[in-house]
């Protein structure tokens, strides 16, 4: 009779395994690092370090999924997102999921699906992390040489860099595909107060895209944060994705040049410091982007920017007083300047009063009222639409810097509606994270350079308090 199963079924699996679940070889005597140094104990154990990284990714994705579902469960469709303390649903809405004209949420099911998908993938990552941390081979070099590495192997390190760059480029292209083929993105500038649309006429002109990088970061110039249309944003992602993928292929196929081998420190801690520096810069840029930019971060979801709330207040009172008979073109304020309208330093007609310092604000609810010389007096008298009045009144009372009367004020004053703008939250958190990542960069870069020079910087191992504490086990 034919045997339907392998006669070797009881033989041990031939992959290299760590036969015990005990975490041997992870103590200070073996690694030179105490338990609280975390992954430093795994510097030369590529299999275990893989487990730590995969488990860490699982925790991140788990937070995203759980917080996503938490926000869906608490979401009230009748209130704007920015009034509900949401920080994840605004991102999904900006990508065009579940929203219609004016940023109104018409379907929360895509948000639910997003949360569930993240939870499921976090379980897969969590399993992989536990497997590699406890059961899988301690090192990958012998059994899986493609995934193994030695920190000082410069060619292998640039190959790993190349793989990372290709994955980042693919991520950039995901946004491009969403904008072009999969329903489009939410465009706050769409006529009538914003809508979801496919971005078909993307900007590929390198002069425009790279021109942003050459702009001044100050004032109305605003560096890359000044981008005010989705065509440029999606085009920028095409360029960025292409550069990352081509750069990744380059780093996989080539070996580092002699000047690069001499210039860099080639150790695990050095690579950590480079990564921390990069993510610190990203944190600071994200801080500025979410605070000032109302195209990539539409005010319908994140609340108004500071300048936007201030200009909305001036606009709201102009509308009110004009209805009461005021001549907004000629009325003077207490200083003799225009009470409602005045001239900017470059001659345009702008809102008067304290909000004059925000004269170069651009916002979708205000731009239709401008002419070639700034605000158009004729349009202000005849063309103001109800949706513009409603939106400015709403934004006026939801400034990211709250104040006593719920209008734009300074950060030290209480806000009457117990309101924290997602812009305040996201920009502050990214600034703080960017700062601490920068401090981490300085710390690890200093240690890496010291180690490369043959001495150690940091806490004195002979006197550190943890040596006098009981071991965890």
Curated annotation (Swiss-Prot):
Keywords: Acetylation, Chlorophyll, Chloroplast, Chromophore, Manganese, Membrane, Metal-binding, Phosphoprotein, Photosynthesis, Photosystem II, Plastid, Thylakoid, Transmembrane, Transmembrane helix
Residues recorded as bearing N-acetylthreonine in the entry: 15
Organism of provenance: Zygnema circumcarinatum (Green alga)
Cellular component, GO annotation: chloroplast thylakoid membrane; photosystem II
Subunit architecture: PSII is composed of 1 copy each of membrane proteins PsbA, PsbB, PsbC, PsbD, PsbE, PsbF, PsbH, PsbI, PsbJ, PsbK, PsbL, PsbM, PsbT, PsbX, PsbY, PsbZ, Psb30/Ycf12, at least 3 peripheral proteins of the oxygen-evolving complex and a large number of cofactors. It forms dimeric complexes.
Binding site for [CaMn4O5] cluster: 367
Family, similarity comment: Belongs to the PsbB/PsbC family. PsbC subfamily.
A UniProt-annotated Pfam family: PSII
Claim: Transmembrane is one of the keywords in the record: yes
Transmembrane segments: 69-93, 134-155, 178-200, 255-275, 291-312, 447-471
Keyword Cell inner membrane listed: no
MF terms (GO), sorted A to Z: chlorophyll binding; electron transporter, transferring electrons within the cyclic electron transport pathway of photosynthesis activity; metal ion binding
InterPro entries, A to Z: PS_antenna-like, PS_II_antenna-like_sf, PSII_PsbC, PSII_PsbC_sf
Topological category with respect to the lipid bilayer: Multi-pass membrane protein
NCBIfam families to which the protein is assigned, alphabetical: psbC
SUPFAM superfamilies linked to this entry: Photosystem II antenna protein-like
Cellular compartments annotated: Plastid, Chloroplast thylakoid membrane
Propeptide feature: residues: 1-14
Protein name according to UniProt: Photosystem II CP43 reaction center protein
Role this protein plays: One of the components of the core complex of photosystem II (PSII). It binds chlorophyll and helps catalyze the primary light-induced photochemical processes of PSII. PSII is a light-driven water:plastoquinone oxidoreductase, using light energy to abstract electrons from H(2)O, generating O(2) and a proton gradient subsequently used for ATP formation.
Domain of life of the source: Eukaryota
Positions carrying Phosphothreonine: 15
GO BP terms in the entry: photosynthetic electron transport in photosystem II
Cofactor binding note of this UniProt entry: Binds multiple chlorophylls and provides some of the ligands for the Ca-4Mn-5O cluster of the oxygen-evolving complex. It may also provide a ligand for a Cl- that is required for oxygen evolution. PSII binds additional chlorophylls, carotenoids and specific lipids.
């Amino acid at each position: 009779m034919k045997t339907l199963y392998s006669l070797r079924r009881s033989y041990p699996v031939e992959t290299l395994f760590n036969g015990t679940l005990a975490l041997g070889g992870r103590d200070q005597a073996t690694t030179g690092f105490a338990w609280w140094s975390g992954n430093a104990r795994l510097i030369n154990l590529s299999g275990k370090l893989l487990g730590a990284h995969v488990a860490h990714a699982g925790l991140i994705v788990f937070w995203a999924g759980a917080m996503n579902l938490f926000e869906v469960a608490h979401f009230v469709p009748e209130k704007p997102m920015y009034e509900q303390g949401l920080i994840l649903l605004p991102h999904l809405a900006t990508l065009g999921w579940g929203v219609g004209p004016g940023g109104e949420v018409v379907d929360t099911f895509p948000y639910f699906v997003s949360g569930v998908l993240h939870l499921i993938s976090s379980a897969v990552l969590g399993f992989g992390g536990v497997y590699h941390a406890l059961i899988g081979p301690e090192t990958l070099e012998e059994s899986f040489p493609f995934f193994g590495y030695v920190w000082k192997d410069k060619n292998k390190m640039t190959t790993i860099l190349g793989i990372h760059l290709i994955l980042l480029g693919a991520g950039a292209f995901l946004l491009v595909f969403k904008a072009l083929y999969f329903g489009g993105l939410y465009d706050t500038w769409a006529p009538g107060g914003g809508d979801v649309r496919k971005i078909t006429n993307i900007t590929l002109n390198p002069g425009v895209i790279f021109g942003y990088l050459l702009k001044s970061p100050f004032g109305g110039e605003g560096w890359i944060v000044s981008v005010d249309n989705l065509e440029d944003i999606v085009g920028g992602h095409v360029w960025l994705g292409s550069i990352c993928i081509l750069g990744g292929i380059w780093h996989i196929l080539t070996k580092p040049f002699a000047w690069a081998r001499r210039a860099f420190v080639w150790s695990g801690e050095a690579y950590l410091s480079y990564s921390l520096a990069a993510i610190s810069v990203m944190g600071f840029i994200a801080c500025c982007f979410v605070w000032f930019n109302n195209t990539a971060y539409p005010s319908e979801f994140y609340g108004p920017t500071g300048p936007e709330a201030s200009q909305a207040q001036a606009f709201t009172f102009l509308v009110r007083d004009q209805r009461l008979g005021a001549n907004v073109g000629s009325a003077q304020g207490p200083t003799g300047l225009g009470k409602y309208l005045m001239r900017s330093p470059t001659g345009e007609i702008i809102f008067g009063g304290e909000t004059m310092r925000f004269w170069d604000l651009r916002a979708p609810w205000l731009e239709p009222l401008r002419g070639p010389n700034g605000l158009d007096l004729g349009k202000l008298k005849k063309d103001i639409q109800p949706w513009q009045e409603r939106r400015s009144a709403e934004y006026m009372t939801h400034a990211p810097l709250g104040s006593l009367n719920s209008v734009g004020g300074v950060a030290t004053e209480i806000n009457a509606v117990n309101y924290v703008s997602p812009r305040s939250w996201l920009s502050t958190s990214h600034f703080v994270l960017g700062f601490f990542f920068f401090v981490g960069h300085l710390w690890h870069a200093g240690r890496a350079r010291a180690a490369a020079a043959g001495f150690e910087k940091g806490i004195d191992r002979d006197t550190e308090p943890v040596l006098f504490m009981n071991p965890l086990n």
